[in-house]
């Protein structure tokens, strides 16, 4: 019985040594393929510094080649401690959601950038709009009772379309949007590529929602 016990222990030790050896061989570092990115380190740093501690993303693309020159998403995480970020994400303890790449996964309203679409639609569909004077009292009330204020609750008084665009008047462009109606404004937006997948070299932009 004693000999059988020793044999069993020796066999177990032998198997354990083989297992450890195999694991060491599997974990040995191997030379991989070289990866060359199009990122500009200096531009990447500038984008990261500009974004600071704010949530959001910054992307710089070469329009001729589609090369991604900079892509920053914040909040970010330490790539050397990915395990901690994954654990926090799975447990739901990190409300900052740093694993979401906001440059490609975020869904955001266009904001005042859309005023350019509204302006284009108004010039095309509202006769004489370029010569009108608008009374900007600082806020506008929509048909459903929703109130939209200007930035910092500013009132601009009697202004023309050019000035309204320069100061990004929510009152004037909200008024124009109501005059145009949903279908007309939607058609203009789609003429500019909204609701369409914009594919090309580098970063593909999915359809708006």
Task: Kindly label every feature range from the protein language model.
Residues 1-57, 72, 77-102, 107:
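Extracytoplasmic/periplasmic proteins that interact with beta-lactams or build/remodel peptidoglycan
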Residues 22-24, 64-112, 117-209:
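Beta-lactam-recognizing serine transpeptidase/beta-lactamase-like catalytic domain environment
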Residues 58-63:
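Short hydrophobic alpha-helical segments used for membrane anchoring or interfacial signaling
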